[in-house]
A protein has these predicted regions:
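Intrinsically disordered, low-complexity regulatory segments
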Residues: 1-186
């Protein structure tokens, strides 16, 4: 079986229809030798400072620069701080099972830097080793999807796009976290 991952459910529905994955399951469609699943945008994000043992806004902690960034499921505001979004955690479990049980993953997240990051962060978070290829389309017409599926590209072709997105994500984190803490301490 091959697993196709789209960035959102509406795109997954269109692709599933084209590949004959008409059986609706929890978190994916199945049929025709495919499982077609989806993210809800960024399912995985960089951990906040407390994920690195840094609590509160303390001048001596600045600048906050992790040795390496940690990926965690997307968080939602809780009574005290943040907690993992239960719907996201559930979808990640479904995707993990599909990815690890597949012979190949077809990446159908949006054709661009963020779409690539959404998939790669999830792939790395899961610790997946299943080979993947890229469906690079900018239209959801039946013809565009079919043509894209006939012309899948090596996932490695998009490594630099992923690295650019990762650099942007990490630099946004560094500027945002350190800027917020520095300005709050100075106020």
């Amino acid at each position: 079986m091959k697993t196709i991952i789209a960035e959102k459910p509406s795109v997954a529905r269109e692709i599933a229809r084209i590949v004959g994955a008409t059986k609706r399951e929890e978190g994916y469609f199945e049929g025709g030798g495919y499982a077609v699943t989806w993210a809800f945008g960024h399912l995985v994000q960089l951990a906040m400072p407390d994920g690195y043992g840094i609590r509160g806004f303390v001048r001596d902690n600045l600048p906050v620069i992790p040795d390496s960034f940690t990926l965690i499921p997307r968080q939602v505001k809780a009574e005290k701080g943040y907690k993992p979004d239960s719907g996201v955690v559930s979808q990640i479990k479904i995707i993990s099972r599909l990815f690890n049980g597949s012979e190949q993953i077809i990446v159908a997240t949006d054709a661009g830097r963020e779409g690539e990051l959404i998939f790669r962060y999830l792939y790395h978070y899961i610790g997946c080793a299943t080979p993947f290829v890229r469906l690079w389309i900018s239209s959801l017409t039946d013809k565009a999807i079919r043509d894209g599926l006939r012309n899948l590209e090596a996932g490695s072709k998009y490594d630099n796009l992923y690295l650019a997105a990762k650099a942007r994500s990490e630099s946004d984190w560094l500027v945002g976290i350190n800027g917020t803490q520095a300005l709050s301490i100075a106020a």
